[in-house]
């Protein structure tokens, strides 16, 4: 997760690129996806768009997405999923995957 943060924003919680915000460059669609997962799990908790500026809440959203779509904690899948979404393509996430792997070393 720290390598993804480094690649996404270099640790800047105020980073903004279009509708991607925070250390993990979270989009409004991802916040909505997290809230849908919480709803399916019958949790009363919900994330707000402003939570993207919080490092802790951004990490929570990352872990929630991974627990739902990557329950076996496959590192490669985690990286590609974060970059390309649920229906990621290997080819279109390859450069990002390599960048994160370099940041992990």
Where is each model-derived feature located?
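Catalytic glycan-binding domains that act on GlcNAc-containing polysaccharides
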Residues: 1-105
């Amino acid at each position: 997760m720290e390598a993804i943060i480094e690649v996404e924003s270099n640790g800047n919680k105020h980073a903004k690129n279009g509708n991607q915000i925070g250390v993990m460059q979270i989009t409004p669609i991802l916040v909505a996806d997290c809230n849908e997962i919480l709803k399916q799990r019958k949790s009363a908790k919900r994330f707000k768009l402003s939570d993207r500026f919080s490092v802790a809440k951004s990490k929570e959203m990352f872990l929630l997405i991974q627990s739902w779509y990557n329950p076996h904690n496959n590192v490669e899948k985690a990286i590609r999923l974060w970059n390309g979404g649920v229906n990621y393509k290997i080819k279109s996430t390859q450069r990002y995957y390599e960048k994160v792997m370099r940041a992990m070393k």
